[in-house]
């Protein structure tokens, strides 16, 4: 078995005295593990950092084997991430989210969002929105997607303002107003295309929305906690948005 594709490095761990097991994600093959021989050497250290873009060639005698990686550097951007905590923590968060999905299962839209994030990692305000969209898509890929296309009560597509925590469906403002304390707020950027800059209220509401459904459908049923980096990242975004304002 053999394939070759552009990949983003998610992580690596020691394997034996001289090698590492590398974890990457690709568009067509999903999240993959493989051995990099000599990966613990100083020469390889810079190449194997999370966030780097590489041309990855994987091969194994049988598909179920761990396999070996041969890598070629494309963009060693990991060193630049160290100076941008939002980008570094964002990468760590998305890597944790990818691990909720089966290994070797392709999820091209999630990969595309990560790829866009890494190409614009110095644009914190863009990336805050991308992370919310990533978590929304993650819910969909796991089978728990939300329906934000129309109001669950009236069927209208206008003035959508809330999301029902019971059904995961949108609710228009006038219908939801009497029960607003029991409903989740719907960020406008998830349903409207606009040139208006996204503000932190929308970002916070987006993370609150995905937090609720990820906790209910994913983290609690699996007996795991949400990644600790997530709360840190939201605080960093809040600080950046307020600084900008």
UniProtKB/Swiss-Prot annotation:
Pfam families assigned to the protein according to its UniProt record, in alphabetical order: RecO_C, RecO_N
GO BP term (any one): double-strand break repair
Record's keyword terms, sorted: DNA damage, DNA recombination, DNA repair
Superkingdom: Bacteria
Gene3D superfamilies noted in UniProt: Nucleic acid-binding proteins, Recombination protein O, C-terminal domain
InterPro entries in UniProt: ARFGAP/RecO, DNA_rep/recomb_RecO_N, NA-bd_OB-fold, RecO, RecO_C
GO cellular component: bacterial nucleoid
Annotated family: Belongs to the RecO family.
Function: Involved in DNA repair and RecF pathway recombination.
PANTHER family, per database record: DNA REPAIR PROTEIN RECO (PTHR33991:SF1)
Protein name from the UniProt record: DNA repair protein RecO
Organism, scientific name: Bartonella bacilliformis (strain ATCC 35685 / KC583 / Herrer 020/F12,63)
